[in-house]
Curated annotation (Swiss-Prot):
Protein name (record): NADH-ubiquinone oxidoreductase chain 4L
Protein's UniProt keywords contain Electron transport: yes
Domain of life: Eukaryota
Subunit and interaction comment: Core subunit of respiratory chain NADH dehydrogenase (Complex I) which is composed of 45 different subunits.
GO process terms (BP): ATP synthesis coupled electron transport
Bilayer-crossing regions: 1-21, 28-48, 59-79
Originating species: Osphranter robustus (Wallaroo)
Location in the cell: Mitochondrion inner membrane
UniProt-listed InterPro entries: NADH_UbQ_OxRdtase_chain4L/K, NUOK/Mnh_C1-like
E.C. numbers: 7.1.1.2
Job of this protein: Core subunit of the mitochondrial membrane respiratory chain NADH dehydrogenase (Complex I) which catalyzes electron transfer from NADH through the respiratory chain, using ubiquinone as an electron acceptor. Part of the enzyme membrane arm which is embedded in the lipid bilayer and involved in proton translocation.
Amino acid sequence: MMSISLNLTMAFLLALAGVLIYRSHLMSTLLCLEGMMLSLFILMALLISHFHMFSASMAPLILLVFSACEAGVGLALLVKTSNNYGNDYVQNLNLLQC
């Protein structure tokens, strides 16, 4: 169990580093966010089953639902941005620019 949770924590940190490094393109940022959410989902499900906390068994499912909603909104934003500007740069999403 320890090596699995360590691997999932490393996957989360790697995806977080990916968000920080590849933050110029929206598609790369969305992929890294999805990796973070999936590693959190698996880690939460494993911890709940390991510690026999079945009263909190709905939490991973709720996290997965929010992850799907985040992916849908992100892809809609990606399509809208690429149609308007022709690229997927995050700097195009800054509403404070003229």
